[in-house]
């Protein structure tokens, strides 16, 4: 497989490369690729499309686009059942949600995050600062910038 000539949708748009994600978002938004590309190129529209999120149905967020439905969920000390959270994810998708925000703040969050990016077609957001505290099992004020960046990198690698 040939290497892509871009890392982000913004970079692709700036280079004049029409990606499959840009084409899909333009169709969903009932606009032409020519209308969408400048908005992506200048940052007025973002198309979150991590290459490790294999089942992603791309969506655009930003200026001149329709409002998206986001659902917040995740495990906590009080509710630790990842299967229940996945049921919530699938219900949200069935009801039309385009984005899922994983606010998990307890336990080993990586398997759940990986399951999300394997099975959930919606855009996925996470909160690396929550996971930094969990991952290192330390208070937030003791974490270094490197600790935080390492967790951000881990989240990106998970999709």
Which ranges hold each PLM region?
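Alpha/beta enzyme core
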Residues: 3-4, 8-159
């Amino acid at each position: 497989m040939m290497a892509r000539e871009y890392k982000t949708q913004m970079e692709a748009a700036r280079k004049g490369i029409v990606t499959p994600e840009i084409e899909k978002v333009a169709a969903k938004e009932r606009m032409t690729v020519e209308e969408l590309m400048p908005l992506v190129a200048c940052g007025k529209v973002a198309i979150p499309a991590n290459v490790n999120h294999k089942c992603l149905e791309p969506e655009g967020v930003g200026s001149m686009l329709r409002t998206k439905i986001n659902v917040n969920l995740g495990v906590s000390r009080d509710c630790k059942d990842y299967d229940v959270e996945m049921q919530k994810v699938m219900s949200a998708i069935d009801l039309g949600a385009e984005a899922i925000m994983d606010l998990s703040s307890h336990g080993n969050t990586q398997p759940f995050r990986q399951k999300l990016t394997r099975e959930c077609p919606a855009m996925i957001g996470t909160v690396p600062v929550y996971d930094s505290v969990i991952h290192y099992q330390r208070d937030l004020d003791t974490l270094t910038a490197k600790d935080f960046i390492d967790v951000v990198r881990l989240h990106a690698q998970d999709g």
